[in-house]
């Protein structure tokens, strides 16, 4: 092909004719990011002989300014007539094809390298995808038109070009340096076989990452579930338990399978891509994506499970859209059965959603079918997505992980770990979430509403608002095998039993959930709305003049740059003034002018809503805010005291907010933050003692505002402890303490004018009490009553004096005493 001037002329004419219809693009700009050494020969390798594929590659190389594959290339003193070859050689005149044969071009290049006729040669694997979809056995439309795992014939390729040619994607992969392989001195033949094997594996993994594994039809998949031994056993037990025939029990299992299974359809994926492209451009100012390249690298050869945070219903669509646009297979998505609504449910199912009930309790047959469905997805290499938080976060915080799906994943992996599983955390950060008005009601205490198809019209009515930007950050992957090696060494050799439920499963699953939550928080995207919310909600009147607010924001940005939370955390562009203008443009800030300048404030509605956006990043500011709190009641504190009180309080902050640092790392991290405080003028250091600025200074005001970021959290801690101490030993249960804390917090919020409903969120008190139990500070007797360690008094009085103002401590103690006098604990 293209070996003579006449054939090159014909090829050029064919390419021009092809591009009268075809439109192509490189996946993630891969042609523009190749790191090629132009002084050394470059060869492109395609998997199968295809003139149309070659024409597309030639066009993309021309667009990117890369060496063209159809032009001659010098290899030492020898001139190769073209700079490409096929991994599977072209057929001979009789149509015969040696699929294991070695390309003559590759043979000659390796020979030249072995003879040192040339220093090196670069091999660039290139994949061309006509459309992007997994294959299905019985869908004639897709078998004819979409890229799949089947060998493509000329007629089928022609139809593919006509139907899918306007959605052609090209992936240029990292160059392979042949010199590195030749220098292994394995001889000509073995080196050629090694190169051939490397390329063959590469193309297989690349294809799986982009179009997905080879899949079977949904009906066949569901039928296959009921033939699994574990499901057959569950069917037999169901028949015996319910006194029905095996046929009826099997029919019920099939109904469960059809209720659960997705119906992944390429036409719907393409339809959603077109609709969502319009939607994102209509409603958002842009989508920022970070570290998707790392996902592309790890997707090859792994079973990928995406574990995003859950802030909005459009999380499902956004992640699938971005993966598809970046040349990765959209995942099969776990969705609550409440979303299986008329019209919407069918669309989501064809877009990759599979549906699950909120609880599996009391239905072992459903449990067996669901577990087997997930095991099938995992073992066949389908990417999967589920939300470890369970539901959407209404408060903006990372919710405590629901470990059900993680446990199913762990058990599936223990059953068969042929394909390594990797969890990919995905942080999705909104400057304004679509469901903001709904969340506003729920933040004010309204009950959670059931999803309805009519919610769509509410979203459409909100399109006139400005929603800013969305950031999607891919965090540090968690390889399940490595995690198990750390948590349970020797797990591969253990006898796990037929149900794959080792005794350590629950504890290990809980630790895995915490690891995922921390990795999600590490990938946080800090945006202007987060920072403005953090600053203004820390003021007593929810207001600052514009210059003061800009100074606060500049301080926060400087601190975050001095002590980065994690390599995966991203910061907004611009200074404090630019951030303010951005948030004003979204109508989240009110403004009042007077003779002295501008006052920026939050009205009542936005004040509640902005707690949601503050909470998105509270975990990042919790530790520096805690350190700043120590200086609200003390002018001078030694490093040793700072560390002692930090270590006393940090475990509870870490448990609530999923902060990344372990207790062993605190010394170094605290030193970094203290150094940053000194650099910004918030503290002075005298030997081993840190000194706060004068109370009348601007720096002390900034230090105070920072400390208030975590004030309500610390007040909740003190409330629970004060109530417990006043109740006495073995006098109150955890549930009773939760209720009392909630009532007390509601009363204090009225007394002190706190407009933050999460202040009396019962679940936060529940988790704090559990943390006290985990730390050994509390114990439960056989009746469930709580007793406390003597250290609790020290924690309450010693640390609380350092971080809470005297009037707040007095008010909390007074309310606790009033409760004891009015409602004595039951004996």
UniProtKB/Swiss-Prot annotation:
Q: Which SMART domains match?
A: PlsC (SM00563)
What name has this protein been given in UniProt?
A: Glycerol-3-phosphate acyltransferase
Protein's organism: Ectopseudomonas mendocina (strain ymp) (Pseudomonas mendocina)
EC number of this enzyme: 2.3.1.15
The UniProt transmembrane annotation reads: none
Name of one Pfam family that matches: GPAT_C
A Gene Ontology molecular function term for this protein is: glycerol-3-phosphate O-acyltransferase activity
**What is the reaction catalyzed?**
sn-glycerol 3-phosphate + an acyl-CoA = a 1-acyl-sn-glycero-3-phosphate + CoA
Q: Membrane topology for this entry?
A: Peripheral membrane protein
């Amino acid at each position: 092909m293209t070996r003579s001037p006449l054939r090159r002329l014909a090829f050029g004419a064919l390419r021009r004719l092809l591009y009268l219809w075809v439109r192509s693009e490189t996946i993630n700009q891969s042609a523009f990011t190749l790191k090629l050494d132009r002084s050394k020969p470059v060869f492109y390798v395609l998997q199968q002989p295809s003139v149309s594929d070659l024409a597309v590659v030639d066009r993309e190389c021309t667009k990117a300014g890369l060496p063209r594959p159809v032009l001659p290339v010098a290899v030492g003193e020898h001139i190769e007539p073209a700079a490409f070859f096929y991994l599977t050689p072209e057929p001979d005149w009789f149509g015969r094809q040696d699929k294991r044969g070695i390309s003559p071009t590759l043979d000659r290049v390796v020979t030249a390298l072995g003879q040192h006729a040339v220093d090196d040669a670069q091999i660039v694997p290139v994949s061309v995808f006509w459309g992007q979809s997994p294959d299905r056995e019985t869908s004639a439309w897709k078998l004819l038109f979409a890229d799949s795992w089947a060998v493509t014939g000329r007629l089928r390729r022609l139809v593919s070009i006509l139907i899918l040619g306007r959605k052609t994607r090209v992936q240029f992969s990292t160059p392979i340096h042949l010199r590195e392989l030749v220098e292994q001195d394995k001889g000509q033949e073995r080196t050629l076989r090694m190169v051939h094997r490397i390329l063959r594996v590469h193309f297989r993994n690349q294809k799986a990452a982009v179009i997905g594994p080879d899949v079977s039809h949904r009906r066949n998949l569901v039928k296959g579930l009921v033939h699994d031994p574990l499901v057959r056993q569950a069917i037999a037990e169901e028949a015996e338990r319910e006194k029905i025939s095996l046929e009826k029990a099997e029919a019920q299992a099939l109904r469960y399978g059809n209720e659960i299974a997705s119906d992944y359809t390429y036409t719907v994926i393409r339809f959603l891509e077109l609709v969502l492209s319009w939607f994102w451009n209509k409603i958002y100012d842009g989508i920022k994506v970070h570290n998707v390249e790392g996902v592309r690298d790890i997707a090859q050869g792994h079973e990928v499970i995406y574990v995003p945070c859950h802030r909005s219903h459009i999380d499902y669509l956004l992640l699938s859209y971005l993966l598809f646009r970046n040349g990765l297979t959209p995942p099969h998505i776990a969705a609550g059965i409440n979303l299986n609504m008329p019209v919407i449910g069918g669309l989501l199912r064809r877009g990759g959603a599979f549906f699950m009930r909120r609880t599996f309790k009391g239905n072992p047959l459903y449990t067996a079918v669901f577990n087997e469905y997930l095991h099938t997805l995992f073992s066949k290499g389908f990417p999967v997505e589920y939300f470890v938080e369970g539901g959407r976060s209404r408060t903006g915080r990372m919710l405590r992980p629901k470990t059900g799906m993680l446990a199913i994943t762990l058990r599936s992996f223990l059953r068969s770990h042929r394909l390594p599983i990797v969890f990919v955390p995905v942080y999705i950060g909104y400057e304004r979430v679509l469901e903001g008005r709904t969340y506003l009601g729920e933040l004010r205490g309204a009950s959670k509403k059931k999803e309805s198809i009519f919610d769509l019209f509410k979203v459409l009515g909100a399109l006139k608002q400005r929603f800013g930007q969305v950031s999607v950050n891919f965090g540090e992957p968690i390889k399940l095998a490595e995690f198990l090696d750390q948590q349970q060494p020797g797990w591969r050799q253990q006898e796990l039993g037929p149900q794959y439920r080792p005794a350590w499963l629950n504890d290990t699953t809980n630790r895995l959930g915490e690891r995922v939550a921390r990795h999600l928080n590490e990938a946080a995207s800090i945006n202007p709305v987060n920072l403005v919310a953090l600053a203004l909600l820390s003021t007593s009147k929810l207001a600052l003049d514009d210059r003061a607010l800009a100074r606060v924001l500049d301080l926060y940005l400087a601190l975050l740059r001095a002590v980065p939370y994690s390599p995966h955390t991203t910061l907004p562009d611009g200074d404090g003034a630019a951030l303010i203008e951005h948030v004003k443009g979204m109508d989240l800030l009110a403004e009042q002018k007077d003779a002295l300048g501008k006052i920026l404030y939050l009205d009542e509605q936005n004040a509640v809503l902005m707690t949601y956006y503050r909470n998105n990043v509270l975990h990042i500011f919790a530790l520096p805010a805690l350190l700043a709190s120590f200086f609200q009641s003390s002018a001078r504190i030694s490093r040793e005291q700072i560390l002692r009180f930090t270590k006393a309080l940090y475990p509870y902050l870490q448990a609530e907010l999923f902060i990344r640092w372990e207790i062993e790392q605190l010394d170094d991290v605290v030193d970094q933050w203290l150094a940053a405080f000194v650099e910004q003028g918030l503290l002075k250091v005298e030997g081993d003692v840190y000194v706060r600025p004068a109370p009348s200074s601007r720096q002390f005001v900034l230090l105070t505002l920072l400390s208030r970021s975590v004030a309500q959290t610390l007040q909740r801690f003190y409330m629970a402890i004060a109530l417990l101490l006043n109740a006495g030993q073995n006098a109150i249960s955890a549930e009773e303490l939760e209720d009392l804390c909630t009532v007390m917090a509601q009363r204090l919020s009225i007394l002190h004018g706190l407009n933050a409903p999460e202040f009396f969120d019962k679940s936060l008190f529940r988790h704090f009490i559990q943390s006290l139990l985990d730390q050994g500070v509390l114990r439960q007797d056989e009746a469930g009553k709580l007793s406390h360690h003597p250290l609790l008094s020290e924690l309450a009085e010693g640390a609380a004096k350092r971080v809470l103002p005297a009037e707040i401590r007095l008010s909390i103690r007074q309310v606790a005493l009033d409760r004891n006098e009015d409602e004595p604990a039951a004996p």
